[in-house]
Every structure is written in C-alpha cells, then in structure tokens.
C-alpha cells in the first residue's frame, strides 16, 4: 500500500484511519455506537478505516508498537482517556518514536472518562455536551480533517519508570475517585459523581512535598545534571535524588487534599476544570487544594466546576499556577496516582511539558501560542 501525503494541518481526502476501540469501555456500548453513530459519517466523508477491538489492558500499546504506521493517515481511539494513554506511550516506545508520535490522533469518546474529547470539543467552539452528542461532535471534527498540535507531559518516577501523559496526573481526592469509582464504570461518566460523594464522606489528607517551575521563571544556568533517556530530553528536570533547582518554587504546605496537573481544559466531559482556557505551548495547569478545606466547600468547588465557575468562589484552599515542570514527593505510599485515568503506584514523581509535541484532530488549525512552539506540521510521507 502506497503512503499518502498529509498537507499542512489537514488530513488528506480520501483518508485512511486505523480505529482502535475498546468494546468494554464505559457502558460497554462503544462498538454499537461506532457502527450506528460514527461509521455513517466516515463513509460519507471518504474516510476508509480498519477497526480493531482491543482485548486486554495494554493491547493498544502493543498494537501501535508493531503497526506499520505508513499505511494510515491517522489513528482514532474510541474509548476513554486510558486507551489514548496506551496509544501515545506505545508510539513513544517505538525505535522511530520521533516520527511515530507525529502521526495524527483522534479521540472518539466511548469510555467512562472522556476528558480529552471534551477538551477538543471545547477548543472547537462547541457547547459542553456529553455522551452521544460529544461523540458526534468529535466524529464531525474527524470528518473536517483539521489538525492542531498538543502538549505532551513527560514523567519520571522514583522506581525509574518513564511514561507520557496526554491529559493529567492526579494525587489525592481526584485519584481516589478514579480508583474507587471503577466498580461503577457501567454507569458511564456518572461514576465520577457517585465516587465524589463517597470520597467526600471520608475525606483524606495526604502529606508530601510539592515543587514547581512557574511559567516565565528564568534560570541563571541550566541544571548541571539533566535527565537524558530515550525520548525527548527533559531539560528542566534533575534526578529525583537531587534537590530541585534553586529557581523552582517549593510549596511550604505539606498537607494536601488533592494535587492535579492538567494539560487541557476538562477533567471529564462534565468537569470544566480549567476555565482559564487552553494552555499555551509548553505550559500546563497545576491545581492543588490544601488541607483544612471543609467537605461542604470541596463539594461546592466540584459542583461549580461543572460549569467552570469554581475559580469564582475564591476558595482560599484552592491554588492554581501555570507551570512548565513539577515534582511531587509523597511522604508515604498511601493512595495512588492517576495518570490519564490509569492508576500508578504512589511514589516520587516529576515531569515537564513538551510544547506542541503531538498532532490531534481538532476544530482549530491554530497552534497554542507561547513558549518554544517548535513543532512543524506532521511530516509528509515519502
């Protein structure tokens, strides 16, 4: 099969797409929804596709590691955010990761956590919607073929793991809700509402050290020992055994209800977590809630977050900072981390954002402005 060219910022017409679908995601109806809601639009828009159903955890990761990507103009992922996490990490594990990660991606919501799709929906100028309405909007964006670059978060853990996030890392309340609501996944995204009320009933406090590199901070010199591994070089990070560089900000408080690092606007299709808008290139949102917040105040925050109004409450315990890197060192192994909705062992972790590092189907062809916007258009196939 001959590869095709990808014009700047647009998928070609006709277009070939590899669709990875988790039939067990969300309410377990993703396949039926694809056949009834997505497929007719694709056929009309001259988008041919191959559909692969994932069979187990990390199946999508294995598939994209081995796939001949030149056969496809884009990869579409129909599930929750976790399957996109698998795909991106699979692409970054390939020997040709530098070109593989530029293969355009499309998020089709079919899971119980659809924050990435909700964010793309927001960037396209659509109203906040859920379920089949959100799926149809994202399908229409694929049919329109427009691409936009997105930031990528590189993470390192104390045990030596390196992984990548396309959406978020959370610790504390949000991660607990992710974990404990898993048993309600057949309810769809309402599982998070149920989980929130259960967790509010028994609010936990987590102890740890949080540090970050704010946007606009200029170092007198680059750290002497930056992390160098396969993949993009994390120039702002030093090994976890070393103290953070002196130009970083260390949060004096060490008791938290939650810490959230977020690359996009939504935490779910019904949680507009970052109403300040799309991150600039090379920037991510850091939110944390300090211990001392009451259950009632925390509930008000999450209820207001449904409409993006939580920052207007001026809660003294809620802090938001735009950052380019962070480090979080839990004092114990109690609890978990959630990375793009996928659970990770609780241990020291740090990360930095890489600007405009991957391409996604989106409603706007404009790249996020700001820091070091280096990525060009997706490469044309030879």
UniProtKB/Swiss-Prot annotation:
Short motif Nuclear export signal 1, span: 147-155
Expression sites by tissue: Widely expressed. Expressed in brain (at protein level). Detected in neurons.
Gene Ontology biological-process entries: blood vessel development; brain development; calcium-mediated signaling; cell population proliferation; cellular response to hydrogen peroxide; cellular response to vascular endothelial growth factor stimulus; DNA biosynthetic process; inflammatory response
Gene3D superfamilies: 2.60.200.40, Probable inorganic polyphosphate/atp-NAD kinase, domain 1
Top-level class of the enzyme under EC nomenclature: transferase
UniProt keyword list: ATP-binding, Calmodulin-binding, Cell membrane, Cytoplasm, Endosome, Kinase, Lipid metabolism, Membrane, Nucleotide-binding, Nucleus, Phosphoprotein, Synapse, Transferase
Function: Catalyzes the phosphorylation of sphingosine to form sphingosine 1-phosphate (SPP), a lipid mediator with both intra- and extracellular functions. Also acts on D-erythro-sphingosine and to a lesser extent sphinganine, but not other lipids, such as D,L-threo-dihydrosphingosine, N,N-dimethylsphingosine, diacylglycerol, ceramide, or phosphatidylinositol. In contrast to proapoptotic SPHK2, has a negative effect on intracellular ceramide levels, enhances cell growth and inhibits apoptosis. Involved in the regulation of inflammatory response and neuroinflammation. Has serine acetyltransferase activity on PTGS2/COX2 in an acetyl-CoA dependent manner. The acetyltransferase activity increases in presence of the kinase substrate, sphingosine. During neuroinflammation, through PTGS2 acetylation, promotes neuronal secretion of specialized preresolving mediators (SPMs), especially 15-R-lipoxin A4, which results in an increase of phagocytic microglia.
PANTHER family: SPHINGOSINE KINASE, SPHINGOSINE KINASE 1
Protein name (record): Sphingosine kinase 1
């Amino acid at each position: 099969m001959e590869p095709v060219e990808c014009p700047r910022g647009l998928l070609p017409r006709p277009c070939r797409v590899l669709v990875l679908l988790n039939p067990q995601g969300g309410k377990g109806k993703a396949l039926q929804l694809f056949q009834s809601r997505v497929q007719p639009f694709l056929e009309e828009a001259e988008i041919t596709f191959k559909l692969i159903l994932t069979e187990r955890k990390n199946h999508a990761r294995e598939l994209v590691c081995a796939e001949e990507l030149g056969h496809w103009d884009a990869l579409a992922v129909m599930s929750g955010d976790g399957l996109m996490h698998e795909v991106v990490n699979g692409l970054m594990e390939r020997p040709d990761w530098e070109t593989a990660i530029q293969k355009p991606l499309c998020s089709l919501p079919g899971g119980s956590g659809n924050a990435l799709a909700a964010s793309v929906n927001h960037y396209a100028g659509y109203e906040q919607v859920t379920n089949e309405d959100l799926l149809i909007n994202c399908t229409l964006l694929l049919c329109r073929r427009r691409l936009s670059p997105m930031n990528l978060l590189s993470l390192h853990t104390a045990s030596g793991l390196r992984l990548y996030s396309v959406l978020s890392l959370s610790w504390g309340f949000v991660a607990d809700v992710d974990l404990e609501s898993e048993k309600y996944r057949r309810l769809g995204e309402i599982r998070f509402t149920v989980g929130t009320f259960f967790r509010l009933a028994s609010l936990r406090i987590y102890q740890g050290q949080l540090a970050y590199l704010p946007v606009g901070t200029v170092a007198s010199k680059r750290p002497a020992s930056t992390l160098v591994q396969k993949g993009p070089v994390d120039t702002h990070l030093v090994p976890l055994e070393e103290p953070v560089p002196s130009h970083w900000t260390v949060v004096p408080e060490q008791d938290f209800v939650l810490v959230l690092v977020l690359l996009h606007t939504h935490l779910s299709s019904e949680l507009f977590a970052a109403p300040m808008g799309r991150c600039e290139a090379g920037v991510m949102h850091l939110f944390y809630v300090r211990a001392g917040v009451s259950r009632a105040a925390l509930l008000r925050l999450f209820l207001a977050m449904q409409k993006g109004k939580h920052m207007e409450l001026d809660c003294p315990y809620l802090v938001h900072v735009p950052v380019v890197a962070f480090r979080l060192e839990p004092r114990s192994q109690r609890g978990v981390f959630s990375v793009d909705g996928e659970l990770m062992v609780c241990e020291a972790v740090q990360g930095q954002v890489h600007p405009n590092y991957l391409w996604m189907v989106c409603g706007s062809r404009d790249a996020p402005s700001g820091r070091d916007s280096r990525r060009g258009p997706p490469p044309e196939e030879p």
